[in-house]
Amino acid sequence: MKLWAGRFHKELDQKTNDFNSSISFDSRMVREDIEGSIAHATMLGSCGIIDSTEAKQICAELKKILDEVESGALNIDLESEDIHTFVEGELTTRLGAAGKRLHTARSRNDQVALDVKLYLKKQCDVLYQQIQEFIVVLCHKALDYKDIVMPGYTHMQRAQPITFGHHLMAYSEMLQRDMSRLADTKKRMDECPLGSGALAGTTYPLNREMTASLLGFERVTNNSLDGVSDRDFCMELASDIAIAMVHLSRFSEEIILWCSWEFKFVELDDAFSTGSSIMPQKKNPDIAELVRGKSGRTIGDLMTLLTMMKGLPLAYDKDMQEDKEAIFDAIDTLHMCLTSFIPMIETMKVLPGNMRKAAAGGFINATDCADYLVGKGLPFRDAYKITGELVAECIESGLTLETLPIETYQKYDVHFADDVYKAISLESCVNGRKVIGGPAPENVEFQAKRVLKIMGVK
């Protein structure tokens, strides 16, 4: 069945037909297509555009078709051009003339825009809930390790001591922004395009607000041209997903480093690791590596959508068929990555001793030494210079700031006293950072509990 065959005298070339078809990937929207058709038929009957009895027949049969497809009793015909053609063809086979009335006052252009929006709205909710689940896992783990000292890094060099709980809460913040972006995107796509027709609306007296309400949309689109040609919602969701995947990729990179013998901060559970076919000792963080790699895939999906849309005149162009494979792939990728990543982090074994050992080296408490002098009345720049000289002294003598004799300290500045050793201890360095957003254990506990409350967890 072809919905556009009237003016043609030849059948479409078979290879071209295969090239033109989208049923292989848009069939996942069968529920959304039927939901949209039921709302459309209900509205047509209510407005007297088609007979109300026929409208009820159409709706009842569409529900049967959906039930049969989802139960496996009816297979989607992959020879159909797209999911819209399959559903309408199946309906017409069953109802005859009544089925042919369904497409009154509707184009595939506004139909597909509707289907994609309905599908993506649902997927926004799915991804939102998954990310929320991940945040809860991170918060619980942060509470467990709120006082475990580890090095904080800049330029991949040990910089200042923090806690592992603080580090985990940094990713919680990123993921909360991801949730916020998804919610914002859903708000902007909450406009029903049905009634826009091919591009110029319709002469039929439609009740667009009725179909929008039946389908759970907040409002209708305000311009028929924009209604059928807009794919901002696809690009925006793809951007949200790409950013979320970049966050997962950064976390993955750290997990990969932390699992190495050079760091040995964490150990992944066997259920989320693989081995080598030749090296018996290997335990590889393949899940984290795959997530890191797949982030590039979602960035590619975003680039596909942006590049596809950048040169299209209004209104609909066949190029826009390419939107679905890109956005579906992005959705599937993030969903799949989160499905494995969340339990990988939840079951990850933390090795506090190795974290603390790493934090004890590299003069990670030098800033606190400078702050000690500031507390004694010195300007920070002077304190900074003196501490730098002390670090150089330690390096030359093979000592640390903790083992450097007090006499040597006082050679550089008379303000140093025995209390400097307490001031530069790892516990003091971390516990003293009670500023909002700082790594002090009490801060980590407060922030984790605050976020859990926001997530609805008591």
Model-derived segments and spans:
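Glycine-rich cofactor/substrate-binding loops
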Residues: 1-36, 97-98, 279-458
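Short runs of predominantly hydrophobic/aromatic residues within well-ordered alpha helices
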Residues: 37, 84, 88, 234-237, ...
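Charged, flexible cofactor/metal-binding loops and thiol motifs
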Residues: 116, 124, 128, 143, ...
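A helix-coil-helix interface module used to build multimeric assemblies
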Residues: 1-201, 206-213, 274-275, 286, ...
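Positions in alpha-helical segments
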Residues: 39-42, 118, 122, 235-239, ...
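Conserved hydrophobic residue
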Residues: 49-50, 74, 264, 379, ...
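Short alpha-helical scaffolding segments that buttress acidic/His motifs in well-ordered protein cores
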Residues: 41, 62, 138, 241, ...
